[in-house]
Amino acid sequence: MTELTTLIADRKANPKPGSYTNKLLADKNKAAQKVGEEATEVIIAALAQSDERVIEEMADLIYHSLVLLETRDLSWSDVVAALENRHR
């Protein structure tokens, strides 16, 4: 997870032409839309597809969620901290 969050932050700091990540980082609405689409795909996979497909769709959801966090200058660490605070 650290490697992926570092890559996304690096794309934001050092954009690469043609990068899908950069396209999402430049458009918060598009990033949010992709999170919604991927969440729907996770639900569909969980209800009617293979375990492998569930894992693939969940990976897509996590990636797009991390990009959306980065558009808001938030991080995976912020999410982990919120989860930890819920269990105190």
Q: Residue spans of the language-model regions?
A:
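Flexible "arm" and connector segments at domain edges
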Residues: M1-M58, I62-R88
